[in-house]
């Protein structure tokens, strides 16, 4: 049959695009609301005019309230957060900030590396958190989710900052 070679290639491509040969399709996880109170230790440089730069580490425990399904009660899970940050903190000018973090869940069995980018003045920073890579249960993790944070400098203790962060709808994708 002469027309057979022309039909085999398109059918093969169609089947492969449906995931039969490539494995299951990626699954988006809607984890729910997440929040963290964090503490930072490092160096704070006073730039004058109320502007400061913080360079150091941020640590905290993220609490994620997983949405309930049916009559099941909501569950709260925790994830340890360790970050490196250089933050320009200004009362007058909205400044971009970048924070790099390792998240450890399930007694350290599951690791995720995230990059947080936000912009704002002292007290508030709005932006996104991007899942870069993961190991264990987070292997192959991707996605971007909205992020809001507050940053406060402890005037009494040298080199310490405090803050909180919130993810109203924490989501990510796993293969």
Where are these regions (language model features)?
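Absolute N-terminal positional cue centered near the fourth residue
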Residues: 4, 19-21, 29
């Amino acid at each position: 049959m002469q027309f057979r070679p022309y039909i085999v290639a398109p059918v093969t491509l169609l089947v492969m695009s449906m995931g039969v040969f490539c494995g299951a399709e990626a699954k988006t996880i809607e984890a729910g609301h997440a929040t963290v109170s964090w503490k930072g230790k490092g160096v704070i440089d006073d730039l004058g005019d109320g502007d400061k730069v913080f360079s150091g580490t941020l640590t905290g425990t993220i609490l994620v309230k997983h949405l309930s399904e049916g009559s099941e009660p909501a569950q709260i899970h925790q994830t340890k957060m360790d970050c490196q940050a250089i933050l320009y903190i200004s009362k007058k000018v909205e400044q971009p900030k970048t924070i790099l973090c390792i998240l450890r869940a399930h007694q350290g069995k599951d690791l995720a590396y995230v990059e947080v980018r936000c912009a704002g003045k002292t007290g508030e920073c709005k932006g996104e958190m991007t899942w870069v890579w993961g190991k264990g249960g987070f292997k192959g993790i991707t996605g971007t989710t909205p992020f809001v944070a507050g940053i406060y400098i402890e005037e009494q203790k040298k080199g310490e900052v405090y803050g909180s962060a919130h993810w109203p709808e924490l989501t990510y994708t796993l293969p």
